[in-house]
Amino acid sequence: MRYKKLYPAVICFCVFLAAIGLVLGDPSTVLPGLWKIIVTEDALITDYVKIAGVSAALVNSALVTLVSLLLLYLSKEPPNGFTLVELGLMAGFSLFGKNIVNIWPIIAGTFLYAKARREPFGKYVSVSLLATALAPVVSYVALDNGFGNLWWGIAVGLLIGFVLPPLSAYTYKIQNGMNLYNMGFACGLLAM
């Protein structure tokens, strides 16, 4: 199996990310920085390095990537090139907009969709991770937009996670499967 060492390699990558974060910045700022990341309204593009420092931003990226890896592993998703792309996207976008808290309502929404369809979550775990492209919307609604609150943020996240699996299947058909990032198109349609 060509990708059998993918999971250990990604774990090493996450440890490296966290270690570099601790070396480049002050380790005592990591937990307050993570808290600042979590409670920041993520409007448009929010640079976590600017908000909380390099240490907290890299540790956030490591945590989000580890959670993603754990979900893929527990769902028995066979590792492949697309798995690596998903993990790379999760790591990269965890530096701005996506954090260890705001991804959960969307993942839970996709889990509920799988249960409603009476199908294993493993079938939708990739869609779930890519759907977290809209995780900043959860933070925006939950934290500071004038009309939302925590419960509205969770509800919006659940709705996003529930709607994106069938929407992404539809956009895949529109594009004839030619685009690796068909979830980007689906997320864009839903975000509008």
Enumerate the language-model features and the residues they cover.
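Alpha-helical multipass membrane-protein architecture
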Residues: 1-192
